[in-house]
């Protein structure tokens, strides 16, 4: 029998009542009935974890990586069975760690592997990769600029680097390494206008906001005790959410760079954050076997989604109330072998 604490998912504590003007009722918003949905878990036998999932910009495709050298892409409205995935292989010589989609084109995506030190660019309409970029560092996390022409990535050595897309002879677009000042950081992402970068570091208690392309430090708000692991930008441009080892999520006002509110629903280290398309809801992945959904404007916990495994990645669909997340079940003595998992929660219809 597994320990009792692994059988039961704790109920998140409710914070004090929020100001009335921030509530859904006063603002005329009818939230989804999250408790009516059930997680849909898709298991794949594997000794490795599925560690990253990402939606295409139109929400029609979902990519997952982590268990091998292959990137799997589903069209969730048609099915999420393993056999229904389109397989993209041949770009990497070792396990793929991360995948991200071009924000301006629903068929273009890229993958990275820390072991083979490559970032590979793909077109979902073709089986072969468009380009392989070999690096001197092991890439960990990548993010496109809003125009899809620049890539920021962080390395296993916790440093930030850039790739740029340019035209070569014949009009073909090619990505190449851009030489810039090396800045330390564990995760980096562009702001919505592309003129700034949000940078977190696993061993620093502050966030850093840099101007781009100068990389001048603009803001350094204190965020977490013991390091910051996750960050997400509100699509409305109001808030920056950050999560760290202290199990707390902070919401920073992007106008004044003060902490507008704090979410304390989680009992575990925060690993991933994602805002819904309208910015009203925040999904929180952690080292616990659940995903929390909280209201952005009140920080109130709305629903705790039971998960088969801790979720290293959670991500909302770009236009619907659907969350994708992934992970790997734990090995139990006398129990079944661990399996990789990709899960969906919400209504795709």
What are these regions (language model features)?
Residues 2-349:
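WD40-repeat beta-propeller superdomains and closely related acidic/aromatic-rich repeat-like regions
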